[in-house]
Structure formats: structure tokens, C-alpha cells
């Protein structure tokens, strides 16, 4: 049964605060990262350490950060990146993230194996089955893991295939994630490197999202 928007709204004070194991102020995303987890978050890990995960790792209500980019609220984040990387200008970095964050799905709710997508006052949902993971090696030499899920309901208008990437390689509650969505195949999504809509916990204010991004 689909998660209803009103249910998500009512639950904001209880459900989504606990679901991502996210405590703002102390930047606590559950238990502290181990050395292996910290290296994995930076794209360095042994393939043998990658483990399967369940959809419950992404349980919660999540907001797209694309509107924050469009409003200019993420400019301090891009400026920090430009200051740290002298090979790219602020404008180049912002353009890169503009392409990456672009999406019309404003909110995502995840509960009991069901993912609900909210777009322009329209809602689609489906129960997703786990389809394994894929380890990717990027041009930079760093690696990442995508966790694959499939909607097998032919009547659903939700994306047939979705993939999560959150810099985590083993079971752990997510604090933010990139998601890849489509109807062609998992492989076509694995080839997508330029558009990775990004979501943070819904209860965070824009200032808190910026603070989170600046701390990483």
C-alpha cells in the first residue's frame, strides 16, 4: 500500500527524524564511521568489503536539493569547492552540480519496501525488489557502489528501475543519497554519470542542508 502524502506530513516529527538515524547539530549519522567506512565514503575500498543492503537503509522522507541550487542557497558550497580546487571556477562547479541535481521529483518517501515519488502535485509509487549491487570505477580512479532495485508492478507509473548511491558500501542508515531512475534497464542507469538527483532528510532547513554539505 502506497505511503500517503498526508501520512508523511503527519509523521514528520516522528517518522523521518528517526528513520535516517540523523541528528543535526552534532552531524551524527548513527554510529561513528569506521576507518574502512570513512575511506569508502571517499571512494577508496576493497571490493570484498562491499555488502548487500536492504531498502530500509533509505527509509524516510527526503527533499530534493535542486530547488536550493536554483535559488542560490547552495552558492556557499560551490564557492568552497572552487576555493579548494583552483582548476575549476565557481561557475563551472555550479554548472556541474546543476546538471547533476536536476530533477522534477521534489520529494521521495520510503517505507516498508515502497518508494513514493512526488512530482508537481502528482504521486507515483511502487514496491521495489532488491536487484543486487554494482561496483563502479570512475575516471578519477575512485570507486562507488550503486544499489539496484526494480519495480515489478506493470500497473505502476513509478520508475521501473532505481539505483541508490550514498558513499556507503554496507548496511547503514543513509543520511543523504543520489538516485538514478529510469524505465529502460539497470545497465542504462549504470552508464549515467552526469545526472544524479540528490536528496536530504525532509525535516532539514535549507540552512541545515548547506551546513551538512559544507561539513563534508
Curated annotation (Swiss-Prot):
Keyword Cytoplasm: yes
Keyword Nucleotide-binding: no
SUPFAM superfamilies from the UniProt entry: Lipocalins
Induction description: Repressed by Zur. Up-regulated in response to extreme Zn(2+) deprivation. Also induced by cadmium and hydrogen peroxide.
Signal peptide per UniProt: 1-23
Superkingdom classification of source: Bacteria
GO MF, one annotated term: cadmium ion binding
Keywords: Cadmium, Cytoplasm, Metal-binding, Nickel, Periplasm, Signal, Zinc
Residues that coordinate or bind Zn(2+) 2: 176, 212, 216
A UniProt-annotated Pfam family: ZinT
InterPro entries named among the record's database cross-references: Calycin, ZinT_dom
Record-level GO BP terms: cellular response to cadmium ion; cellular response to hydrogen peroxide; cellular response to zinc ion starvation; intracellular zinc ion homeostasis
Chain coiled-coil ranges: none
Its biological purpose: May function as a periplasmic zinc chaperone or mediate direct transport of zinc from the periplasm to the cytoplasm under zinc-limited conditions. Binds zinc with high affinity, and can also bind cadmium, mercury or nickel. Preferentially binds Zn(2+) over Cd(2+). Contains one high affinity metal binding site, and can bind additional metal ions at other sites.
Family: Belongs to the calycin superfamily. ZinT family.
NCBIfam families: PRK10306.1
Protein name as it appears in the record: Metal-binding protein ZinT
Protein species of origin: Escherichia coli (strain K12)
Amino acid at each position: 500500500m502506497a505511503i500517503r502524502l498526508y501520512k508523511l506530513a503527519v509523521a514528520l516529527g516522528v517518522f523521518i527524524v528517526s528513520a535516517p538515524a540523523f541528528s543535526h547539530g552534532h552531524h551524527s549519522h548513527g554510529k561513528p564511521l569506521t576507518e574502512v567506512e570513512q575511506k569508502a565514503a571517499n571512494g577508496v575500498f576493497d571490493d570484498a568489503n562491499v555488502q548487500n543492503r536492504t531498502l530500509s537503509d533509505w527509509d524516510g522522507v527526503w527533499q530534493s536539493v535542486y530547488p536550493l541550487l536554483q535559488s542560490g542557497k547552495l552558492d556557499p558550497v560551490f564557492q568552497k569547492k572552487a576555493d579548494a580546487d583552483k582548476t575549476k571556477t565557481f561557475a563551472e562547479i555550479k554548472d556541474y552540480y546543476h546538471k547533476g541535481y536536476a530533477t522534477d521529483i521534489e520529494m521521495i518517501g520510503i517505507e516498508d519496501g515502497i518508494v513514493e515519488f512526488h512530482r508537481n502535485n502528482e504521486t507515483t509509487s511502487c514496491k521495489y525488489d532488491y536487484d543486487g549491487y554494482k561496483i563502479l570505477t570512475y575516471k578519477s580512479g575512485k570507486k562507488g557502489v550503486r544499489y539496484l532495485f526494480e519495480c515489478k508492478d506493470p500497473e505502476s507509473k513509478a520508475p521501473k528501475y532505481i539505483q541508490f548511491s550514498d558513499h556507503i558500501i554496507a548496511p547503514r542508515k543513509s543520511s543523504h543519497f543520489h538516485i538514478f531512475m529510469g524505465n529502460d534497464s539497470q545497465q542504462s542507469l549504470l552508464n549515467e554519470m552526469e545526472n544524479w538527483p540528490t536528496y536530504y532528510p525532509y525535516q532539514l532547513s535549507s540552512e541545515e542542508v548547506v551546513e551538512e554539505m559544507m561539513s563534508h
